[in-house]
Design a protein with these regions (language model features):
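N-terminal low-complexity, acidic/polar interaction/targeting segments
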Residues: 2-165
């Protein structure tokens, strides 16, 4: 039997976005981030003053010639759940994935980081808490296949956090 519980969260129409290659966050997972670039330190500062929400997304075909990389269309909105500033000015952040989003358009601004208008409509199911019985052997096979796929692609995944789910 599956039961669905909708989490109450106000989803913003525009979000700051952190494009990070070889990095994926999924809804309901928590990942560590080491923030050291000044523009993303500014982004975290602004986010901490408001709703603590930022978007994570993969850049497309990143190369050294692109000053502003093109992005994939789908990313994940995350909430900062832990924050620590280091002595050398870096931020150690834990980000909890909430819901996937689709980029609508980039918002022009004077900020050093990028902001986008986004749409969550196709991903509301990410906010549901599913309580479902799965066989442990099914999960082992799924994780084995996922690990293999992500290792081939060079993605960094917090497997310990995923296994808690």
């Amino acid at each position: 039997m599956i039961s669905y519980i909708m989490k109450k969260i106000e989803l913003p129409k525009k979000i700051p976005v952190f494009p990070l290659s070889n990095f994926i966050i999924f809804p309901k997972t928590t990942v560590p981030l080491n923030i050291f670039e000044p523009r993303y330190i500014d982004m975290i500062n602004e986010s901490m003053k408001s709703n603590k929400l930022i978007g994570m997304i993969q850049p497309r075909n990143l190369n050294n010639e692109q000053l502003i990389p093109k992005l994939h269309n789908i990313g994940c909105l995350g909430k900062i759940v832990s924050f620590k500033e280091t002595e050398d000015g870096r931020y150690l952040v834990e980000l909890k994935g909430l819901i996937r989003f689709e980029i609508i358009e980039e918002i022009k601004s004077d900020k050093k980081y990028r902001e986008f208008e986004v749409n969550f409509q196709n991903f509301y199911q990410d906010l549901n808490e599913k309580k479902e019985e799965l066989k442990f052997s099914d999960l082992e096979l799924i994780f084995k296949d996922l690990k293999s796929l992500f290792e081939k692609r060079g993605f960094i995944i917090n497997w310990k956090e995923l296994e808690k789910q």
